[in-house]
Amino acid sequence: MPKAFFMVRSVVIEALRQKFDRWYSQQHLPMALTEFKCEKCWRFWSAADAGVHYAVYQFADMARLDAALKSDGFKVLVADYDKTWPSGVTRTRDMLTLAEERSA
């Protein structure tokens, strides 16, 4: 079964970027790692658009990702995000299936 990834893309206004970065690193990412029970996760800031932040969570397969997104823990994460960022941050989510992986 191929790996599955959950990606959250957030667009953050400039005035909130430092606060958002600190919150995501210190609070939300550790909480998500615990609640999702994912294999690992990454965070990125876009080099092309400084206000775009990505968080990516890796799961063993799509069934595990689906289960994580149906969990009470996911509802807690969404509520925490919405409460902390009622304005100034917008987000979209996507579910990805690994199609191919190569090494040099």
Locate predicted features.
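Short, glycine- and small/hydrophobic-rich beta-strand elements in well-ordered beta-sheets
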Residues: 30-54
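Short phosphate-engaging motifs
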Residues: 16, 51, 64
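Active-site-flanking beta-strand signature of metal-NTP-handling nucleotidyl enzymes
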Residues: 3-11, 54
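Structural beta->alpha junctions
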Residues: 11-15, 60
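Short, low-order "capping/linker" segments at domain edges
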Residues: 95-104
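K/E-rich alpha-helical interaction surfaces of small helical-bundle regulatory domains
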Residues: 15-35
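An amphipathic, aromatic/His-enriched active-site/gating alpha helix that lines ligand/cofactor pockets
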Residues: 35-39, 58-95
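Short, flexible turn/loop "capping" segments at secondary-structure junctions
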Residues: 1-4, 47-49
